[in-house]
C-alpha cells in the first residue's frame, strides 16, 4: 500500500514497467491495506513495529535484523517464477538483508532504489535525537545511534537500528550484494 514516498515510487515503477510490456512480480510484507496481488501468498508476515510495545520489539529483534521467513518465501517465489532481475526499494528492518544471499544464490542481478540514507546512517536521516545534523556513524561506529537516541528519540528503536547496522557491517553488507544503485 502507499504508505509514503518510497511506496509511491514502487507502485509508479511497476506501472511504468508494465506499460513497457514487462512482467513485474512484487515481493513485500503482508498487510491488510495491501493492494491485491497474485503473488501475495509469498508475502511475509511481519508486524508494524512502530505500533508495537517494547516487549514485542524485542521479540522481533532477530527477524528485524535477519528475516528467515522472507528468505524462504523469496526462494520459493524465485523457484516458481525465475525472475531476470530484482529491483529493491525497501528491505531494511522488515524483509531484511536475508533476501540478498538468496538473490545471489540464484544469480539474479540486483538494483536498489535508494530512498534514504539507511546504508550509512542507522536512523536514515543524518540527524541525532535532538534533530541536529550528525555524521557520528560515518566510520561505522553505529552505537552513536543508540547513545544519542537518533530514532524518534527512543532508546529501543535506536538500539534496534544500531544492532541491525552492526549485523550488516559484519555479515551481510548490501554493498557486496547489490549490483546497481539508483
Place the predicted regions along the sequence by residue:
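Short, flexible loop segments at the rims of nucleotide/cofactor-binding pockets, characterized by
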Residues: 61-66, 87-90, 156-163
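A short, histidine- and acid-enriched strand-loop-helix "catalytic/donor-clamping" loop
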Residues: 93-94, 114-124, 179
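Short beta->alpha connector loops
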Residues: 1, 68-70, 91-94
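N-terminal subdomain of nucleotide-sugar transferases
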Residues: 1-33, 79-81, 96-99, 103-109, ...
Amino acid at each position: 500500500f502507499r504508505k509514503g514516498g518510497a511506496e509511491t515510487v514502487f507502485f509508479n515503477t511497476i506501472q511504468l514497467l508494465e506499460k513497457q510490456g514487462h512482467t513485474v512480480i512484487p515481493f513485500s510484507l503482508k498487510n491488510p491495506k495491501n493492494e491485491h496481488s497474485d503473488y501475495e501468498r509469498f508475502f511475509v508476515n511481519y508486524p508494524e513495529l512502530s505500533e508495537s510495545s517494547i516487549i514485542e520489539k524485542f521479540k522481533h529483534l532477530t527477524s528485524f535484523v535477519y528475516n528467515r521467513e522472507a528468505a524462504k518465501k523469496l526462494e520459493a517465489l524465485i523457484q516458481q517464477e525465475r525472475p531476470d532481475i530484482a529491483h529493491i526499494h525497501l528491505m531494511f528492518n522488515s524483509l531484511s538483508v536475508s533476501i540478498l544471499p538468496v538473490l545471489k544464490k540464484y544469480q539474479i542481478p540486483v538494483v536498489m532504489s535508494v530512498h534514504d540514507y539507511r546504508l550509512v546512517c542507522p536512523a536514515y536521516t543524518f540527524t541525532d535525537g535532538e534533530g541536529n545534523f550528525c555524521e557520528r556513524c560515518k566510520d561505522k561506529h553505529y552505537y552513536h545511534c543508540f547513545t544519542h537516541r537518533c530514532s524518534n528519540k527512543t532508546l529501543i528503536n535506536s538500539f534496534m537500528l544500531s544492532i541491525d547496522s552492526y549485523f550488516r557491517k559484519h555479515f551481510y553488507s548490501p554493498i557486496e550484494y547489490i549490483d546497481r544503485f539508483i
